[in-house]
Each structure stands twice: as structure tokens, then as C-alpha cells.
Amino acid sequence: MFLQPLLAKKIIAEVKKMYEREVIIVNTDGLIMAGTNDERVGQFHEGALICAKERRSVIITKEDETRLKGVKAGINLPVFFDHDVIAVFGLTGEPAEIQPFGELLRKMTELFIKESRHLEQSQWRERMLESFMIDWLQLKEWSPSFLEKAQLLGVDLSSRRQMILIQGYEWSPHDIEQMARSWKSSYPADLFIRWGNERILINHEVPQHEQRDRLLRKILHICSFANTASSQYTAAGAGRAVASSSLTDSYEQAEKALAVSLKRKTPIFEEDLKLDMCLTEISPGTRNEFPQRVLGKALEHQELMNTIRTFFHHDLSLKQTAEDMHIHINTLRYRLAKAEQLTGLRFDRTEDVVTMYVALYFLDQDTK
């Protein structure tokens, strides 16, 4: 591994905050990559080259300034990664004074590089997982390269799989990492993938004796963490368990379940969908037109629409609706009569009640 100039500049920027003397970072060929003095960047530093080749600290004296090219009195320290010298850290000043700082800054630099490398590897794996998942959902037949990726990622293609979609708001990489660690502590073979800015995709490897309650508890735990992290509601939809070769079916089911979860504000398993299963199949054009056709002029009265929603929420109970809205029951009867007048529908006819419910379903879901 070689230290990249961009990372070297970031390290120098951090060093500047805690150390006032001149500092440089030099590559293993002796070229200065970054420093507190920009004029020295790109220059050759013979002392650093010796330091890199001999894998040892090199003290530069005033006398050395005349015989070694590009040096200033100070100290050069090798920076190690996995036992290899990847750069040289140089400090200008009296060696006895600056050596303690030099050792401290070198250790800090090595830790910084390790963290950067870990993040780089993590991001590489995330990109590879996302690419692999897209292939898995799109390929009609598994190609040799796909099978090779599966083997590299340790994915068992013979197991049954279940797709789970979680949707919220943008999470930080740290939040994603924490959620992934929590999930994989229970299901280590699962693929936990950031799926766009607002979604997480979980490719769940279904155990032989799956316990749905356990899976639901884990989904609720992740949603609870995500809600806290973003201060917004997080929805979750789960498809059915399928063979690995039929993963697209489970993904489409998870999409349907997620749409219902956004409305009901609770995690949804596709296998539990009943009326929603039919309603999610209706075309967008019909979904947009139907509320206008059914509710008509009632849509212009916000208080009236809130009353209708609350009435349905309480299963058409006059008493519970009036209590929830803090209004007299006669006021509620007046509003419902007004709704019947504007819509031409009646709350004592089953067909009209179903029609109005479906109109509200489409209206509320499509305005989210």
C-alpha cells in the first residue's frame, strides 16, 4: 500500500491544528507529497529516502543540510502500515525537542491511515454488495462472474431468502454501520445494504426453523434505532421466503408491503396483506382520479375530511369519534350529514362505506 497525496494533505491539515512547527509527509521515493509549507511540495528529500529504505528514524543536523538534498535540520520518521513503510513523516527543529512530538504525530498518522483504510475497504464492499444485489435482481440466469462474486462475498445461493426493505430519511454512514452490526449480530449471513439515500435493503437468509416473531422483533429494533437517529418515522416491508433464484418475487412483495407500512406506520409482512394486496395493484391514473370522483366537493373542506378520516379510524363509532375530536356528538352527526350531502354517499350503506374508504386510502397514500 502507498499513501495517497490526498490523504497526506488531510493528515497535514489535522496536524496543523495541534503542532505549529514545519511538518512534511514524503513518499517512499523521497518526493514531498504534503506539508505545512506548500513551497516544498513536489521537491526531493534525500533524508526521507534514506529513512524509507533503511526503515529507521533519521536525524538531520545542520551539517546534513549541506550534503543531503532538500533537507532541513530535524527528524524523519518512517510511517508503517502492515509492517511496510508507506511514507515518511518529517519535522523541522532541534531533534531533542521535537522527537517526542514526532513519535506522537507518527502514531496518530498510522492510526489515521488504518481508519482511512478500513473506511475505504468498507465502502468498496458496500459498492460490490450493491452491484451484486442489482445483478441478482436483474439476471434471468446466473452468469459465471455472478457466481464468482457470490463465492467471494460468502453468499450461499442454495438457501431460501427473504427481502426486507426499510425506508426512512438519510442516515449517516455511522448510523448505517451501527444498524448493520446490530442486525448481523442476530443474522450474520444476511446482506445489509444501503439502497439509495433513504432505504436499506436486507437480503435475509431464512433459517431452517425461522421464527417470525424473532424476525419481527429485530425489524422493530432497527426501525426504533432509525427513528431515533433521524427523528422521523421509519417504515419496513418484508416479502415472502423464496428460493434464491426467485429473489425478484420477494423484492416486489417487499415493495408492496413497504407501501402499506408507510400508511399504517408499522412494519408489514406481505403475507398479511388482504385488501391492501388488491389496492396496490390499481394503476396510478385510477388512484389519482378515484378520490376526486368519490369525494368531490368534500375535498375542499379540511375539517370535514379530518372528521371522515377519524370516523373511519374508530370503525364508524360515533361515541369514540366525538371523544377523540373533542366535539359534541350532535356536531359530529351534522358533519357526517354534510359529508353525505357533498358526496352523495351514505354511511349506513355498505357499498358506499367501502367506496369512501378506498377513496381515502388512495388519497392519503398518494399524498405521502
From Swiss-Prot:
GO biological process, one term: positive regulation of DNA-templated transcription
One MF annotation (Gene Ontology) recorded for this entry: DNA-binding transcription factor activity
InterPro entries given in the database record: CdaR-like_regulators, CdaR_GGDEF, Diacid_rec, PucR_C-HTH_dom, PucR_C-HTH_sf
Gene3D superfamilies, sorted: PucR C-terminal helix-turn-helix domain
Any single Pfam family the record assigns to this protein: Diacid_rec
Family membership noted in the UniProt record: Belongs to the CdaR family.
Protein name in UniProt: Uncharacterized protein YsfB
Upper lineage: Bacteria, Bacillati, Bacillota, Bacilli, Bacillales
